[in-house]
Amino acid sequence: IYLGGDMGFCGNLNSLVKGRCQEYEKNGGSVERIIVGKKLKRYEDPSVILEMSREEYMEDHQAILDILAQGITQKRYSEIRLIYNHYRNASEIDFEDKAILPLPKGLIGDQAYLDDFVWEGDPQEMLQDLLILYLTYELEIAGHVSAAAENLTRQNVTTESLKRIDEREEERRRIERKERKAEEFSKVLDNFTRLRNY
């Protein structure tokens, strides 16, 4: 699942995600892709099973959840990866290629459960539901974190652009002041020369 951006100034973020997409293509194998983000679209790619814009994803991404649920119940996927840009803090955004299936080692930890419980019915169904819930959770978190990364990038680029505009404006004013001073000095020098000649 590739989570890219749609808004302005996200080309660098999308290029990292797109680069990883191309790496997986080179390695071959049977891959199904879900692409979120207009700028990541890959036309006429048979491995893409679903494409949607970032806006469509934020409004309703049930189609992705349905594909994941169907893949789990039919045991179609040996691996599911989320590829996105991860917002860490106000100054740090990392490229993330996260395997969410099979479950990461150490997810449960070394805890020993001493409580027992009774389950009536098919435990396979319960485990599938838990796995689908986990995948949904990971997708939700990645979606919001990557949106935050995109917003931070846009904010940083906008701030930098405004700073450069201010620097150019200050440079223009400095040049105007310098020209005005040179003109005033020239007038003073002309007046002094005229007074001296009288």
Q: For each of these PLM feature ranges, what is it?
A:
Residues I1-Y198:
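C-terminal beta-strand-loop-alpha-helix "lid" module of Rossmann-like NAD(P)-dependent dehydrogenases
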